[in-house]
Amino acid sequence: MAFKNAISWFEIPTTDLSRAQKFYETIFSIQMIPFDTPNFQMRMFPVEDMMNGVGGAISKAEGFYKPSATDGPLVYLNANPDVQNVLDKIEAAGGKIVVPKTQISPEFGYMAVFVDTEGNRVALHSVPQ
């Protein structure tokens, strides 16, 4: 058996949902989609086909998880066509670049790592077109 996608959903924790939403909307030039329940608040990343692709969100859920710049899994967000286009917006939006654009290999493209406004370590990935 093989997965269609190894990841089906991800959540990036926030302490200030509005600040995090502004950060991610700025660096990716997107509009996030609100999804709130009595137990948590989310702002989902827009994707072409949420039911068959990989989706994710920034999320605020008291006591469920906390931001970390050093611990836990490292999520790689799609930065196609070029990681640098997103990196150029990180610091002005309130984040910090911790690994600059770095080539993985010619066929696997580039990666970078930043810390967002909430203190989360998040990675970027782009593949040569």
Model-based region annotation:
Residues 45-50, 114-117, 127:
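Active-site beta-strand termini and strand-to-loop segments that position acidic
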Residues 2, 11-54, 105:
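Core segments of cupin and vicinal oxygen chelate
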Residues 7-15, 64-89, 110-115:
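Vicinal oxygen chelate
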Residues 1-21, 73-75, 125-129:
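N-terminal beta-strand motif that seeds the catalytic metal site of vicinal oxygen chelate
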